[in-house]
Regions:
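Conserved oxyanion/phosphate-binding beta-strand-loop segments in alpha/beta enzyme cores
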Residues: 1-3
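Aromatic-rich carbohydrate-recognition surfaces in CAZymes
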Residues: 5-12, 16-133, 146
């Protein structure tokens, strides 16, 4: 079974993988197998790997959107439940601003770089997880991740019309 690397998921989850899920269905199943191997051997789904190594760069956990899209487009793969467990795990790690995101409903700008971008990416990824939870009849996780999917609203400033950072619960004074 082929093993792939350098998915560059932050760059490809929006367009490349959804198209792959339509026209390269067998290859997508191979990608899912690689995700499963990375989960089993590395302890988490990929975020951004390079030459088979986890780099820790890029934001979000976009393998979940690739998996969700593949599932709902009917890509044959026998181990979606294992990938779903990996999705829950990666979305609940204790790093990259996730604890603050879960606590406050956004990532405070003084605690983590790229706070607004991470909040937006996590909210989308959580929406994907909520859809998988619903498909797997996992009501508690559906409710939790559906709520988290709404966190993008917490960084939208009605007065400026922009997504912007918050500092100590208030809009960051340095936003321009």
């Amino acid at each position: 079974i082929p093993n792939y690397t350098v998915f560059s998921l932050w760059d490809t989850f929006r367009a490349t993988h959804p198209v792959d899920n339509l026209i390269f269905r067998k290859k997508t199943a191979e990608f899912l197998n690689t995700f499963q191997n990375q989960l089993r051997n590395g302890g988490q789904l990929p975020i951004w790997d390079l030459a088979g190594n986890y780099t820790g760069c890029m934001i979000g956990y976009h393998s979940v959107s690739v998996i969700t899209d593949a599932y709902f487009k009917g890509i044959p793969f026998s181990n979606y439940p294992e990938l779903y467990e990996g999705m829950l795990s990666i979305a609940n790690r204790s790093k990259l601003g996730i604890p603050a995101y879960k606590r406050f409903g956004y990532i405070p700008s003084h605690s983590e770089s790229e706070s607004v971008s991470k909040t937006l990416e996590y909210a989308y990824n959580d929406w994907c997880i909520s859809k998988m939870a619903l498909a797997f009849s996992d009501t508690l996780n559906y409710l939790d991740f559906n709520k988290r999917a709404q966190f993008y609203k917490n960084v939208f400033n009605d007065k400026t019309g922009f997504m912007q950072p918050k500092y100590n619960g208030n809009w960051s004074p340095s936003f321009s």
